[in-house]
Amino acid sequence: MNYDPGPLPAILDRTRLVYSYTNLNCYENVCPYQFYERYIKKSTPFVETEAMRYGTKVHEALEHRIAHKKPLHPDFAQWEPFAAPFDGFHDDTRDKTVPRQALSTELKLGITVKGECCDFFDNANVWLRGKLDVVVLNGFNRAYINDWKTGNSNYEDRFELDVGALMLHAANPHLTTIKGTYTWLKENRLGEMYDLSDTRHAWTKVTGIVKRIERDRQTGQFEKRPGPLCGFCDVKHCEHNKKR
């Protein structure tokens, strides 16, 4: 017999959540109940899919190419035109007349509940954290973020870039201009260029989602939202799960 007692009563739910784009997006754009099962109750074990493994290999290859000039594997050589432009950025602190240009790959960032910068691994204080694929600090007050995507671009949502810009600005409060793109590798194209400079907007959106999560934790009620992704969901006891 499968018996699911449902969400924990608020008085018993003491899980400390560290937020990320991934879990915020799960709650906001996929299903609040899936969010609960995955990130609070943790009833669904993480299973790495073939697509995930492929994405990791691609990210690692591009990181080594950009950060260490290691040639791309022949399987990924078609994406050299997306990596080559980053070769022109440097960090030359010897010539003070040249605006500082710093290039980072797989940059780990974190912020506290007050929106202040903290270490990605500061488990006592980190409230939101994430990893940015490529970051260029170009000059004294400008930055550019790029996010590699190995899937399809059926629907391009800037929220992931906004979350990245929020954390980047916390670490570099002097920044006045932040722009960002997704690179859709499967389609060999660059996505829309977004102006991410208004990080207050991102902060408002993130805190709004968190408030709704905390409300649901207090009531113990997380919406079971039917949608096209139900057929891929690992919460098998949900009545909307097409795998049942």
Region annotations inferred by a language model:
Residues 14-71, 106-107:
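Nuclease catalytic cores
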